[in-house]
């Protein structure tokens, strides 16, 4: 058994198996269900494609979505799309991006025909121009698994207009600035979602949670609760165990973008989902506001 098979087996045993039901495609939002409520900004742990096999995790994400006002649209920033200049994804329903390898065939049969969000795309362009941020279009780029997996849990009817935006690289200050540029969207009924993992070391999957993973998880929770932006942006030198928790950084920085999109330091920070999967992967997810 090679390392990929071992990793997949360990993640499989960490999740409670179930069969994910297919979802019904929708043509778009019904006007009567739209809202312009001020939205929170969230960061969520998106798991792997196998998250859809975890009854508990699926239910937690759905309950979280149900507890928030229903957004007019979702702006998704996933760990699995890092491109410079910043790129805007498809504004129509296009095939998903199955950006993973070596999984059973059924994971490549998952569909999520969410409607595009062309109006949101236009608004994001305005905000990026106003912030002097270069951007480009990737008109055929569909949702990757860091986007469609949690969306399928939270909005299973696939009726939520969704736009994916790339990360602008992995520099913390640059990512935070992009979040700041997008901040007005939350006042316009748009749910901004950063999708990743606060710890992401696939070589350290185990039955037990290592001390370094628990320590890092506790550290980032404290930093976010205290609104310590300096520590957040300097996490690579300040965070305990960072070299073990984050051999690479693409899964962490979406939380920096999410925090950047919340200008009011007095808004509540909560953790709707916590705990670990695969030993070292924290499921901690964050709501700002």
Task: Label every PLM stretch briefly.
Residues 30-136:
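A short aromatic-anchored loop/beta-hairpin motif
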Residues 24-28:
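Signal peptide processing junction and immediate N-terminal pro/mature segment
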Residues 121-175:
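Internal, conserved structured core segments that host functional sites
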Residues 126, 130, 160, 170-177, ...:
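Surface-exposed, charge/polar-rich loops and edge strands
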Residues 1-14:
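N-terminal secretory signal peptides and thylakoid transit peptides that target proteins
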Residues 40-44, 73-78, 165, 185-198, ...:
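Beta-strand elements within well-structured catalytic alpha/beta cores of enzymes
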Residues 51-52, 82-86, 144, 199-206, ...:
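Short catalytic/ligand-binding loop motif for oxyanion handling, primarily in non-cytosolic enzymes
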């Amino acid at each position: 058994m090679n390392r990929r098979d071992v990793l997949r087996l360990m993640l499989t045993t960490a999740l409670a198996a179930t069969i994910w039901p297919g979802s019904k495609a929708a043509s778009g939002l019904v006007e009567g269900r739209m809202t312009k409520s001020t939205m929170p900004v969230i960061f969520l742990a998106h798991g792997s494609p196998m998250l859809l096999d975890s009854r508990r995790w699926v239910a937690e994400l759905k309950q979280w979505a149900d507890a928030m006002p229903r957004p007019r649209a979702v702006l998704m920033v996933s760990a699995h799309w890092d491109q410079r200049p910043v790129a805007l994804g498809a504004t129509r329903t296009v095939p998903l991006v199955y950006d993973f390898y070596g999984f059973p065939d059924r994971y490549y049969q998952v569909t999520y025909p969410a409607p595009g969000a062309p109006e949101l795309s236009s608004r994001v362009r305005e905000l990026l121009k106003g912030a002097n941020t270069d951007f480009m279009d990737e008109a055929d780029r569909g949702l990757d698994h860091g986007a469609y997996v949690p969306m399928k849990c939270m909005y299973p009817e696939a009726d939520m207009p969704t736009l994916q935006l790339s990360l602008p690289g992995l520099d913390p200050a640059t990512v935070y600035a992009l979040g700041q540029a997008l901040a007005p969207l939350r006042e316009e009924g748009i749910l901004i979602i950063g999708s990743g993992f606060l710890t992401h070391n696939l070589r350290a999957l185990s039955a037990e949670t290592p001390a370094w993973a628990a320590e890092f998880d506790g550290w980032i929770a404290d930093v976010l609760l205290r609104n310590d932006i300096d520590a957040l942006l300097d996490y690579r030198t300040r965070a305990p165990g960072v070299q073990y928790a984050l051999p690479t950084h693409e899964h962490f920085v979406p939380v920096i973008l999410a925090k950047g999109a919340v200008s009011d330091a007095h808004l509540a920070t909560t953790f709707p989902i916590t705990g670990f999967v695969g030993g070292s992967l924290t499921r901690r997810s964050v709501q700002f506001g």
